[in-house]
């Protein structure tokens, strides 16, 4: 008796009685996939190994005492064993750089309460100190205000005035800051101001002093954060302007005769202006510049570059364009028929005017 080596048979057979229908076996290969066990020659499969071994063969043939050849194992190629595969990140195409003279957008900062208290404490003594040099009867320099200096505490009260300029056009007289128009000069002069603020007893000096402030910056994956270290600056007069590649900061220091710190930078990268923000604290100004494209900045700005003159914001440009055809006048240069200056015109009780 000889052993049959056909897959799925495993019986002993007599070579003398061996014929074409003696052996029921599986001519295919066994396979194991996803917990299933089966044969490649038929569709029978099972998850149980015992059931898999008991699956009857699907083909009849003679018994064979020859072992079937083992399936060839794939030859392991070790020729690339020491090869180093370098994976590089895909190169992103850089965004086009906007023009440096693109319109600047004014960033409205969040002001800390401590800074507001500090500025108020600085401005109040300065106003009281300047009152010693103001003569009684001096008219407020704000347009539209007829209040005269009396030397009392009420001189530092609320002022109602026009921040704009007078315009005379096609027989109409009005202020650039509001929409009220009239053809009568007396009504124009008596028109109540549209803005509330403080009285101005002395004209501002155009010769501004310069202050040097230290600034620094750091960056994250999505933002560049800049800090300007300054104290006792007036948040209401200071300006932060930005376009995609340019930052302009102007800080005013009332305690130093309105000296200014002016910083104008061409930024190294491109920023998202709409998401930019600023915070004003008692010891610094912090500006957050969101990156418009991923990547690290090698520096904050391009040093030693001469930048074009700062443009006004789009709103100011539009307003300027609308008023470009109008005629502007300085009220101090206009004389009435009675030969007295309009800025000095007052009634018997000027402080009682509405």
Curated annotation (Swiss-Prot):
Q: Which GO terms describe its cellular component?
A: cytoplasm; mitotic spindle microtubule; nucleus; perinuclear region of cytoplasm
Give compartment(s).
Answer: Cytoplasm; Nucleus; Cytoplasm, Cytoskeleton, Spindle
Binding of Zn(2+) 3, residues: 140, 145, 159, 199
- Keywords assigned by UniProt, alphabetized: Cytoplasm, Cytoskeleton, Metal-binding, Nucleus, Phosphoprotein, Repeat, Zinc
Q: What happens when the gene is disrupted?
A: Results in centrosome amplification and lethality. Cells become polyploid or undergo apoptosis. Homozygotes died as third instar larvae. RNAi-mediated knockdown in neuronal cells, results in severe mitotic defects in the larval brain and is lethal at the third-instar stage. RNAi-mediated knockdown in the female germline, results in embryos failing to hatch due to various mitotic defects such as abnormal chromosome condensation and adherent spindle formation. However, in contrast to RNAi-mediated knockdown in the brain, embryos do not exhibit centrosome amplification.
Where on this chain does Zn(2+) 4 bind? 162, 177-178, 194
For this chain's UniProt record, which GO biological process terms are given? centrosome duplication; positive regulation of microtubule polymerization; regulation of cell size; regulation of dendrite development; regulation of mitotic spindle assembly
- CHORD domain location, by residue? 4-63, 140-199
Q: Which PROSITE patterns does this UniProt record tie to the protein?
A: CHORD, CS
Query: Glycoprotein: present as a keyword of the record?
Result: no
Query: Which sequence positions carry the modification called Phosphoserine?
Result: 324, 339
Q: Where does Zn(2+) 2 bind?
A: 26, 41-42, 58
Record-level Gene Ontology MF annotations: zinc ion binding
Q: Which residues form the CS domain?
A: 210-301
Query: Binding residues for Zn(2+) 1, per the UniProt record?
Result: 4, 9, 23, 63
This chain's function reads:
Regulates centrosome duplication and mitotic spindle dynamics. Also involved in controlling the size of dendritic arbors. May act as co-chaperone for Hsp83. During mitotic spindle assembly, regulates microtubule (MT) dynamics by binding to MTs and promoting MT polymerisation. Promotes the elongation and retraction of terminal branches in response to changes in body size, possibly acting downstream of the TORC2 pathway to enable proportional scaling of dendritic arbors.
Q: Which PANTHER family match?
A: CHPADIPLOID STATE MAINTENANCE PROTEIN CHPA (PTHR46983:SF3), CYSTEINE AND HISTIDINE-RICH DOMAIN-CONTAINING PROTEIN 1 (PTHR46983)
Q: Describe, as the record does, how this protein assembles with itself and its partners.
A: Interacts with Hsp83.
What is this protein's record name?
Cysteine and histidine-rich domain-containing protein morgana
């Amino acid at each position: 008796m000889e052993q049959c080596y056909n897959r799925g048979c495993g019986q002993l057979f007599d070579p003398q009685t061996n014929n074409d229908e003696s052996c029921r076996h599986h001519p295919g290969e066994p396979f194991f996939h996803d917990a299933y066990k089966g044969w490649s020659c038929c569709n029978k499969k099972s998850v149980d190994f015992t059931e898999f071994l008991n699956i009857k063969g699907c083909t009849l043939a003679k018994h064979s005492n020859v072992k079937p050849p083992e399936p060839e194992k794939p030859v392991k190629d070790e020729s690339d064993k020491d090869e180093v595969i370098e994976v590089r990140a895909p190169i992103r195409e850089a965004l086009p750089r906007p023009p440096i003279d693109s319109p600047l957008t004014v960033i409205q900062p969040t002001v800390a309460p401590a800074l507001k208290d500090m500025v108020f404490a600085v401005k109040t003594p300065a106003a009281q100190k300047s009152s010693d040099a103001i003569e009684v009867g001096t008219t407020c320099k704000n347009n539209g205000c007829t209040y005269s200096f009396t030397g009392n505490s009420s001189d530092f009260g609320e002022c109602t005035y026009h921040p704009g300029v007078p315009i005379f056009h096609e027989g109409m007289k009005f202020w650039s800051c509001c929409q009220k128009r009239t053809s009568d000069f007396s009504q124009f002069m008596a028109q109540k101001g549209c803005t509330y603020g403080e009285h101005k007893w002395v004209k501002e000096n155009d010769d501004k002093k310069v202050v040097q402030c230290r600034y620094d910056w750091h960056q994250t994956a999505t933002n560049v954060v800049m800090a300007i270290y300054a104290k006792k600056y007036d948040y209401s007069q200071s300006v932060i302007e930005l376009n995609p590649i340019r930052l302009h900061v102007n800080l005013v220091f009332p305690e130093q005769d309105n000296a200014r710190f002016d910083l104008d930078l061409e930024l190294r990268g491109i920023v998202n202006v709409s998401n930019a923000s600023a915070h004003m604290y008692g010891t610094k100004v912090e500006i957050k510049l969101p990156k418009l494209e991923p990547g690290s900045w090698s520096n904050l700005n391009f040093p030693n570059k001469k930048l074009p003159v700062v443009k006004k914001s789009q709103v100011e440009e539009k307003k300027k364009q609308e008023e470009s055809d109008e005629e502007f006048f300085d009220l101090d240069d206009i004389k009435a028929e009675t030969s007295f200056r309009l800025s000095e015109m007052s009634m018997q009780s000027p402080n009682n005017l509405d």
